[in-house]
């Protein structure tokens, strides 16, 4: 809606190589509302095996387009092509796995000491999920959030890192090719309050899944408190490299 764009740089030479849309607050709001509309539609009502078909189709698209996706992620991040290409094939298995899990979600029957009363639990989709992805592993860390969310019948707004967003916009085109209902998966990128804060304070966002640093995580926790959104945070790990 804002029609603003920005250039993303190739870290090999620090030269611009792609132009991507910059989401305004209105764009972010529009993406969340599209996800909410999709959640109120057919998507969560589909049989799990029907949702599984879309997840498997996403996996197939990843395998068929691994070279293209790997090349884009390499140019955008500087990671080795042999790594990004293999990773695109590898993460297809995430979508396959959660496709298989979609129809295996069970509730429980709880013992209760009152006659003629039965207590049961059931699992239902939570709603709109905001998935916030860091620059250094866009495709992989999207898979860890998107695949389980879709399998359970949720809709998703993916906030791509503004440092290396190009590959997720291409991935979104592949997802669209599967025929998944409009609004189920949305991809945005942008800066500061207009994108990140608007997304994490939005009253229609029920869950926030974030991978990144502790400073941003603290802001997300504060923002999520406004609507009591559920939050899951992955804030890095100890991965020493001996040279």
Positions of PLM-derived features:
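Short alpha-helical
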Residues: 26, 64, 68, 79, ...
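Active-site-adjacent beta-strand anchor residues
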Residues: 21, 132, 157-161, 188-189, ...
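Conserved small-residue-rich beta-alpha loop and adjacent elements
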Residues: 108-182, 228
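Terminal low-complexity tails and localization/encapsulation signals of metabolic enzymes
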Residues: 1-20, 53, 57, 89, ...
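Glycine-rich loop-to-alpha-helix module at the N-terminal edge of alpha/beta enzyme cores
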Residues: 15-105
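Conserved NAD(P)+-binding/catalytic subdomain of aldehyde/semialdehyde dehydrogenases
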Residues: 128, 177-243
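Residue-level signal for inorganic ion chemistry
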Residues: 14, 51, 73, 95, ...
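Hydrophobic packing residues within well-ordered alpha-helices of enzyme cores
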Residues: 95, 168-171, 199, 220
